[in-house]
Amino acid sequence: MTEVDLKALLADVDGDVATELASKPEVIDKGHELDISTLPIQARKWHKLRDAVAVVADLKSSTQLGLNKHAASTASIYEAATGGVVQIFDEFDANFVAIQGDGAFALFWGDKRRQRAVCAGITIKTFSFKHLVPRLEKKWDGLPETGLKVGLGSSPLLVKRVGVPRTEHQEPVWAGRAVNYAAKAAQQADRHEMVVTGTIWDWVSDNDFLAVTCSCSNPNPDLWSNITIEKIPDGDGDREGKRLTSSWCDVHGPEYCAAVLEGKKRRADVTTQRTSALAAEMKSWVRNKAAQDRKNRLARYQGLH
């Protein structure tokens, strides 16, 4: 039987709060490189990443998937979805992965972090559309409409290991907008869709392999559609994001994915399509202002370094 001295417990945690708030913790700037295995739990030290990209993957209608099914069937659906997502994160060298119920999130930092994160996100939605859901629907009749929803965001992050020392009850805690905004983006996506914040779009929009349709037809910049991420606060430039409904092309997908990971940005078959689309987008006062806000915020970040 569990016995708890409630007064002593509350006094203990209250004392911890008082100690924590009595002075500011130390923040160590780690630039773009971080080894999470070295994070302390007792020392009042937070490590700062100058930029990290968060990718969140959620399973639509997950709470309904277990209705009228055996427990083993529900477990199989969760394993198929989440297991596939985690494997994809691993293949794209995610620096940190956490599983959360019906989904998972990953953080990418360091060299080619945006390339790895965006390619991982597109691969997850491709897996959802072309592999996961067709197999689920083939096996179970009357399955609720489901599939993976993906969101991306980026920002500087603070991290510290938090929990109970010398027990398994401890995890890294990530403070910053990246994970929160990626989760909000994923919430607004539908199944097989990827929603990215404005900051992520600023990077994607400069890459022909990502911003323009493939060579199966005439290259077209209408691959991504405008979206306002409603749960991101008004006045934050990241609120004006983009939605991707397409998946990797069976013909050109492997080539384009490899090109992005190699750091390539330009295609010979793309001339003015991408830049013309960006110029048209900037005619919108709302999106133009959001882009300028993001540019100003980036300048402030760089000035603090």
From Swiss-Prot:
GO biological process: defense response to virus
Listed InterPro entries: Nucleotide_cyclase
General function of this protein: Pycsar (pyrimidine cyclase system for antiphage resistance) provides immunity against bacteriophage. The pyrimidine cyclase (PycC) synthesizes cyclic nucleotides in response to infection; these serve as specific second messenger signals. The signals activate the adjacent effector, leading to bacterial cell death and abortive phage infection. A clade D Pycsar system.
Cellular component, GO, one term: cytoplasm
Protein name, UniProt field: Uridylate cyclase
Enzyme Commission code: 4.6.1.2, 4.6.1.26
Gene Ontology terms for molecular function: lyase activity; metal ion binding; nucleotide binding
Alphabetical keyword list: Antiviral defense, Cytoplasm, Lyase, Manganese, Metal-binding, Nucleotide-binding
Cofactor(s) the protein needs: Mn(2+)
Main location class: cytoplasm
Binding positions (Mn(2+) 1): 58, 102
Localization terms from the record: Cytoplasm
Catalytic activity: GTP = 3',5'-cyclic GMP + diphosphate; UTP = 3',5'-cyclic UMP + diphosphate
Subunit structure comment from the entry: Homodimer.
Residue sites binding Mn(2+) 2 per the record: 58, 102
Gene3D superfamilies registered for this protein in UniProt: Nucleotide cyclase
Superkingdom, natural source: Bacteria
UniProt record similarity statement: Belongs to the adenylyl cyclase class-4/guanylyl cyclase family. Pyrimidine cyclase subfamily.
